[in-house]
UniProtKB/Swiss-Prot annotation:
GO cellular component, one term: cytoplasm
Amino-acid positions noted as binding Cu cation in the UniProt annotation, renumbered to this chain: H16, D26, H86, H90
Gene expressing this chain: S100A12
Family annotation (SMART domains): EFh, S_100
Expressing tissues: Found essentially in granulocytes with small amounts found in lymphocytes.
Other comment: In the absence of zinc binds one calcium ion per molecule, in the presence of zinc binds two calcium ions per molecule.
Designated name of the protein: Protein S100-A12
GO biological process, one term: innate immune response
InterPro entries reported in the protein's UniProt record: EF-hand-dom_pair, EF_hand_dom, S100/CaBP7/8-like_CS, S100_Ca-bd_sub
Pfam families (alphabetical): S_100
Amino acid sequence: MTKLEDHLEGIINIFHQYSVRLGHYDTLIKRELKQLITKELPNTLKNTKDQGTIDKIFQNLDANQDEQVSFKEFVVLVTDVLITAHDNIHKE
C-alpha cells in the first residue's frame, strides 16, 4: 500500500473507531463526533470542548438533517481541515 493509500485507510479506520460506539454502526451521532474531534483533532480545531462549537460543526456536517453524520458528510470536515492545513503550510 502506498503512503497516501495508508493515510486514506487511516481516516476510514478513525471514523469507524468512533461510529461503532452508539447508534448506527456506520454513522456518527453528535456525542461520537465530539469524542472524535476532541481526541483526534485537538490541535487543529479550536474550542473543541465547547458544546456550542460542536453543535455548529455537527449542524454544518449533517447535510440531510437526520441527526447523524455519515462518512460522506464526515469527509467534508476532513476536506476543510486539509485545505486549512495546506494553506497554513504556505503561510510559513
